[in-house]
Structures are given as C-alpha cells and as structure tokens.
Amino acid sequence: MHAVSSSHLFYLAFCLLVLTSSATAGPETLCGAELVDALQFVCGDRGFYFNKPTGYGSSSRRAPQTGIVDECCFRSCDLRRLEMYCAPLKPAKSARSVRAQRHTDMPKTQKEVHLKNASRGSAGNKNYRM
C-alpha cells in the first residue's frame, strides 16, 4: 500500500475546493501546474492525455480539437471532465488456467519406459538392461 503524503493530501483538498463550486463563488479554472497536479491526482497511475485520444482512421482534415487546457483553463470544468482525459485502465493479466494448458511433455511411467525399451529389440547387446 502507498502511504499518503502531505502533498497528496494538499492536492486532494485543493481539487475538492476548486472542483466543488459554492453558491457565492464563481466558477474556478485550472491552469498550468495546478491543472497537471489535478490530472495526476484524478488519473493516478493510469496517466492522462492533454487532448482526447482519437479513434483509428481519423481524417487529417477534421475540425480543430479542443483539449484539457481549452476546457479547464479557459473555461471551468468539473471532476468528470478531468476524468475524460485519463488514460484507460490496462486489463489485468489473469493467471493462465492449468486445465487450459496442453501437457505434451508429461513424464512417462516406469511401465511405459520398460515397454518402449522392450519393443526396440536387441541391437547386438543381449544383456541390455534399463
């Protein structure tokens, strides 16, 4: 488990203050290092993108793309908006099932080894034993 450092607690408190708007306060914006710190806190180990990832086969003549700076620095944004820029979770690697594996190199029993040697016949050595 990771210990929570005082800087993480500060960023948590900061994010909560910035991202929760009260009736008297105007909308808040996140810019520069504050925006990066908020994204690191929200996304954690997944990482984040400054622009939303595009799908395959996207046209080079598309409309100009807005990024996190446009949405959270020039305008205000909420926690859900920040989460949209987090990298997707990588699927956990599952342990392979033992039953699903084919066992072709299974050790042979003594009887199988004896029968195999007996079927070879004598190769000039009458006293051949295993």
Swiss-Prot record:
What would be the name of the gene that encodes this protein? Answer: IGF1
- Which Gene3D superfamilies does the annotation name? Insulin-like
| One example of a Gene Ontology biological process annotation | positive regulation of MAPK cascade
Q: Name one GO molecular function term.
A: hormone activity
Q: Which residues form the propeptide?
A: 96-130
Keywords of the record, alphabetical order, are:
Disulfide bond, Growth factor, Secreted, Signal
Ranges where the record places region D: 88-95
Organism whose genome encodes this protein:
Cavia porcellus (Guinea pig)
Biased segments, Polar residues type: 119-130
> Is Iron one of the keywords?
no
Q: What do we know about how this protein assembles, alone or with others?
A: Forms a ternary complex with IGFR1 and ITGAV:ITGB3. Forms a ternary complex with IGFR1 and ITGA6:ITGB4. Forms a ternary complex with IGFBP3 and ALS.
The principal localisation class reads secreted
Q: What does this protein do?
A: The insulin-like growth factors, isolated from plasma, are structurally and functionally related to insulin but have a much higher growth-promoting activity. May be a physiological regulator of [1-14C]-2-deoxy-D-glucose (2DG) transport and glycogen synthesis in osteoblasts. Stimulates glucose transport in bone-derived osteoblastic (PyMS) cells and is effective at much lower concentrations than insulin, not only regarding glycogen and DNA synthesis but also with regard to enhancing glucose uptake. May play a role in synapse maturation.
Compartments in which it is found? Secreted
What InterPro entries does the record point to?
IGF-I, Insulin-like, Insulin-like_growth_factor, Insulin-like_sf, Insulin_CS, Insulin_family
Q: Which cysteines are joined by disulfide bonds?
A: 31-73, 43-86, 72-77
Q: Could you say which protein family the record assigns here?
A: Belongs to the insulin family.
Annotated segments matching region A: 67-87
Q: Where is this region: B?
A: 26-54
Q: What is this protein called?
A: Insulin-like growth factor 1
